[in-house]
């Protein structure tokens, strides 16, 4: 179906024909833990990766399979793996590349949970990270060590929607034989496909825009199929005979799907962050309306940014569509159709004013999720990024008067009227 447009692919890939068992047009929920093999030889072929198909519910599920094929197609990748959460997807992608005594280079302005994983949790497993200004290619190159295993970016940083130059960074990373991992949660494949700009691996928190309704956790890892694991020689778990899978080389067995096959067969098998069939089904419902929702998110965001930019109680709006934003040129390059419905602004005052503004909103829900059809708000410095030191917060342009908004799909008049209530409370 590669010749079809995005809006068609999001509805059909993975289930081009009705369900063969029931003739159902909708994707069924295959609520099972395990699968019957035809005979002993068939079972051995499945476990030996000689025959593709279901083995056990921790590894694969037919509902999950449709979700994986659909997201892989939307991103332009070779294969995908769905897991229990976005956090699991990010962790698996990093651990598939780096082990004890090895190193990651990461954009410093990333989601607080990803920052904590890289800065505090993975060092316990011997994986160190150097955080860099993603706009400074010299700083990125200087951070690369002989034992660096990947460069990690976000298409739109969280919470300020800053934008890295994926093309330039990918070219630099590839010069050093390194894959580039890009979190495209906020970008979505509808607006930007990182593989077209040199990235090698894409990860998503499917909980966000892909699901779109704040109902189900899920994560996705997408393999571009472009990175040559064998030629690199730096990733023996993928390229060499793997002793934990009877000597199979995933690069040989799975070809362009080697990366996600390695994660499925080794990391997911051993640590079990499996997505449930029901969550995969719910996320598929979200995928079917992804383009429609994103268009409405963008339309509303443009009007909110304009409203905030002209409000006397706003100190600064951090949105890359604004000409004064340092990433405005990159925004026009990577997001010609708009984007960044999750962004921040700095209210005049400090934490007290920020909290009072938030506490007087009615339509906006105060919660930690983003990218819901409902409008959301939070105070990053005391919640999502509260584990960061004051210095780390300032380094990410997060202050006590910073408020993060996730603009939903409600009527724009109601969204702006609600923001006015917040401002009225601090006048």
How would you describe each model-predicted region?
Residues 39-91, 113-120:
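Conserved N-terminal alpha-helix of the aminotransferase class I/II PLP-enzyme fold
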Residues 222, 344-346, 406-408:
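Short hydrophobic/aromatic beta-strand micro-patches
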Residues 119, 146, 293, 359, ...:
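PLP-dependent enzyme catalytic core of the Aspartate aminotransferase-like
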Residues 156, 185-187, 322, 348, ...:
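Active-site beta-loop-alpha junctions enriched in small/polar residues
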Residues 2, 14, 18, 80-310:
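Conserved PLP-enzyme active-site core in the AAT-like
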Residues 151, 219-221, 317, 343, ...:
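Well-ordered beta-strand positions enriched in small/hydrophobic/aromatic, beta-favoring residues
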Residues 2-61, 69-70:
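N-terminal "arm"/small-domain region of PLP-dependent enzymes with the aminotransferase-like
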Residues 271-274, 278-280, 285-289, 294-296, ...:
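Conserved small-domain helix->loop->beta segment predominantly found in fold-type I
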């Amino acid at each position: 179906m590669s010749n079809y447009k995005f809006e068609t692919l999001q509805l059909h890939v993975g289930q081009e024909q009705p369900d063969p068992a029931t003739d159902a047009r909708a994707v069924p929920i295959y609520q099972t833990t395990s699968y019957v093999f035809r005979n002993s030889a068939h079972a051995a072929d499945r476990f030996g990766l000689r025959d593709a198909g279901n083995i056990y519910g921790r590894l694969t599920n037919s509902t999950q399979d449709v979700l994986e094929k659909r997201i892989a197609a939307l991103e332009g990748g070779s294969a995908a793996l769905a897991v229990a959460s976005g956090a699991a997807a990010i962790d698996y992608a990093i651990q598939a590349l780096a082990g004890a005594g090895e190193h990651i280079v990461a954009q410093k302005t990333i989601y607080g949970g990803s920052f904590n994983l890289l800065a505090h949790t993975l060092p316990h497993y011997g994986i160190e990270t150097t955080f860099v200004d993603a706009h400074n290619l010299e700083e990125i190159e200087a951070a690369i060590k002989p034992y660096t295993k990947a460069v990690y970016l976000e298409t739109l940083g969280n919470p300020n929607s800053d934008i890295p130059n994926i093309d330039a960074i990918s070219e630099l990373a590839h010069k050093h034989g390194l894959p580039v991992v890009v979190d495209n949660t906020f970008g979505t494949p509808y607006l930007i496909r990182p593989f077209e700009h040199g990235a090698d691996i894409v990860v998503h928190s499917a909980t966000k825009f892909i699901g779109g309704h704040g109902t189900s956790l899920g994560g996705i890892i997408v393999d571009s199929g472009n990175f040559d694991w064998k030629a690199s020689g730096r990733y023996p778990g993928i390229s060499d005979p793997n002793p934990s899978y009877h000597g199979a080389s995933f690069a040989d067995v799975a070809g362009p799907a080697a990366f996600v096959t390695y994660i499925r067969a080794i990391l997911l098998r051993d640590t079990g962050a499996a997505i449930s069939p029901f969550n995969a089904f719910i996320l598929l419902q979200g995928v079917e309306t992804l383009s429609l929702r994103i268009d409405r998110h963008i339309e509303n965001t443009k009007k909110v940014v304009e409203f905030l930019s002209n409000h006397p109680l706003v100190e600064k709006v951090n949105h890359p569509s604004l000409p004064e934003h340092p990433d405005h040129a990159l925004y026009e390059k990577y997001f010609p159709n708009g984007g960044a419905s999750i962004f921040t602004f700095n209210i005049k005052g400090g934490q007290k004013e920020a909290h009072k503004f938030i506490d007087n909103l009615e339509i906006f829900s105060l919660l930690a999720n983003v990218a819901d059809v409902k409008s959301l708000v939070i105070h990053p410095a005391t919640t999502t990024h509260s584990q960061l030191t004051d210095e780390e917060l300032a380094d990410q342009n997060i202050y006590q008067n910073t408020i993060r908004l996730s603009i939903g799909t409600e009527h724009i008049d109601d969204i702006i009227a609600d923001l006015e209530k917040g401002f009225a409370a601090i006048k």
